């Protein structure tokens, strides 16, 4: 593994000279890295023994290098550099994978979908990881290298940002049992803690202030576990002429998820039977 990482790190430093004409060990290393991601054997970010997420930068570099190594080619319904994950899959492969993908769901190769997951017509980008029994609802997007935990619900039209463009240092991470409300957006490497609930239309980036209404504590870049978050606003500074200034968007923690909240956002096991 150390040799693989070394080859990818060195190639990334010389990425300006990497083209579809490149041959040899670089191509083989990137292909092996993408296969590891596609099979779920390795992840762009992994939870360490200390409970902190560790980003495997070499895998993210491999994803970026793959765009330099591959030219566009015709594919069913498109013309792109990245093949689709399910191309030429047999019924047996789908059964073995153990998840459901509704027609219209688009998953790029290099993304991993765990058993029991349900993909409505949605988009899952290269390098992403979708955990067991997670629902990615209609028109939702899971961005490049995003890490989605188990028993998560990504509601309709929600967006989970990627790392490729604009280039981000770390992926978005959604913890187990979290709920992302319809049309919400989580981007720029933000971590959403286990069991957190984002209501409809919450937008959180790295610089978004997440204010705990009960304590006044301000979080940035991380939603605490089991926090229930809604859109809010901060009073603006007065304008030079003394008039009230425009308010600024923020996210507000209104409470900690209780049993009633969890029952409203819980996984419907009737929808998770992939073999039926």
From Swiss-Prot:
Keyword ATP-binding appears in the UniProt entry: no
Superkingdom of this protein's organism: Bacteria
Single GO MF annotation: 2,3,4,5-tetrahydropyridine-2,6-dicarboxylate N-succinyltransferase activity
Compartments where found: Cytoplasm
GO biological process, one term: lysine biosynthetic process via diaminopimelate
Gene3D superfamilies, per the entry: Hexapeptide repeat proteins, Tetrahydrodipicolinate-N-succinyltransferase, N-terminal domain
Gene Ontology cellular component terms for the protein in this record: cytoplasm
Main location: cytoplasm
Pathway: Amino-acid biosynthesis; L-lysine biosynthesis via DAP pathway; LL-2,6-diaminopimelate from (S)-tetrahydrodipicolinate (succinylase route): step 1/3
Keywords, comma-separated and alphabetical: Acyltransferase, Amino-acid biosynthesis, Cytoplasm, Diaminopimelate biosynthesis, Lysine biosynthesis, Repeat, Transferase
Family to which this protein belongs: Belongs to the transferase hexapeptide repeat family.
Database matches in HAMAP family: DapD
Protein name: 2,3,4,5-tetrahydropyridine-2,6-dicarboxylate N-succinyltransferase
Source organism: Zymomonas mobilis subsp. mobilis (strain ATCC 31821 / ZM4 / CP4)
């Amino acid at each position: 593994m150390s040799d693989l990482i070394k080859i990818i790190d060195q190639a990334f430093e010389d990425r300006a000279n990497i083209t579809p004409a490149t041959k040899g060990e670089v191509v083989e290393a990137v292909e092996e890295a993408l296969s590891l991601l596609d099979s779920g054997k390795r992840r762009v970010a992994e939870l360490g023994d200390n409970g902190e997420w560790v980003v495997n930068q070499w895998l993210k570099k491999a994803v970026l290098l793959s765009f330099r190594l591959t030219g566009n080619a015709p594919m069913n319904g498109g013309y792109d550099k990245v093949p689709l994950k399910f191309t030429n899959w047999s019924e047996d492969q789908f059964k073995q994978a153990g998840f459901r993908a509704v027609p219209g769901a688009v998953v790029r190769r290099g993304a991993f979908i765990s058993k029991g997951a349900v993909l409505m017509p949605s988009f899952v980008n290269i390098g992403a990881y979708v955990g067991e029994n997670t629902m990615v609802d209609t028109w939702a997007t899971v961005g490049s290298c995003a890490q989605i935990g188990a028993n998560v619900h990504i509601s309709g039209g929600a967006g989970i940002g990627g790392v490729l463009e604009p280039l981000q240092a770390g992926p978005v991470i959604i913890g187990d049992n979290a709920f992302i409300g319809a049309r919400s957006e989580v981007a720029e490497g933000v971590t959403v803690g286990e069991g957190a609930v984002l209501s409809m239309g919450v937008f959180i980036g790295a610089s978004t202030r997440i204010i705990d209404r009960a304590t006044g504590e301000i979080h940035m870049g991380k939603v605490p576990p089991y926090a229930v978050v809604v859109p809010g606003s901060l009073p603006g500074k007065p304008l030079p002429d003394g008039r009230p200034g425009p308010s600024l968007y923020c996210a507000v923690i209104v409470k900690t998820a209780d049993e009633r909240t969890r029952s409203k956002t819980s996984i419907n096991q009737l929808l998770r039977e992939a073999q039926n």
